[in-house]
Amino acid sequence: GVEDTTMNDIAQASKKGRRTLYTYFKSKEQIYMAVVESELEMLSTQMEKAASKPVSPDKKILELIMTHLDAIKMVVYRNGTLRADFFRDIWRVEAMRKEFDRKETALFRRVLHEGKEQNLFDIDNVEITADILHYCIKGIEVPYIRGQIGEELDDETGWRYVAKIVYGALGCKKKENNHI
């Protein structure tokens, strides 16, 4: 984790000199924060791309969920230190991702509004529904990353289950061919 990592370790891994690192960062914690911020910014970009795809809102909402879970999983696995800290110090990660969470919830709202306007979703309150959707997805991140959800299922079958739950919760009116 971050605590066991030295500035020398970081300098070697980044192929930079320690002096160079200290020019930009006062501590290894600042470097850690910069890495997390950078990863969250890339994640936001991926989410924005998914939300901007020219597909119907019912497909788009699933695309957002898949993008979120797969991207978080890749970030955590790509960064060994982040992986350890993600599971050990979830509160620190939580504080750092507030802006990402805000942007993601706004994307959910946008897609839910689209779906409601197109009469695809039967939801009473878009804002509350977006918040609930966001926290549901966030709540399954750790089991998803660890491969504990539907480990015996192939991806297509697993996502069909997700689609059924999501579409049911959103009162999805278009029933034919709703899965990705």
Give the role of each language-model region.
Residues A50, N79-F86, Y144-Q148:
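Secondary-structure edge/capping motif, primarily at the C-terminal ends of alpha-helices
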Residues V2-Q30, A34:
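Helix-turn-helix
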Residues L69-R109, E117:
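Short secondary-structure transition hinges
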Residues D122, V126-A130:
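Membrane-interface starts of transmembrane alpha-helices
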Residues E3, L120-F121:
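Conserved hydrophobic residue
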Residues A106-Q118, D131, Y135-I180:
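C-terminal peripheral helix-coil segments that are non-catalytic and often amphipathic
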Residues A34, S38, T45-M74, T129-L133, ...:
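Hydrophobic alpha-helical connector segments
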Residues Y32, V36, L40, E94-T105, ...:
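Amphipathic, non-transmembrane alpha-helical scaffold segments
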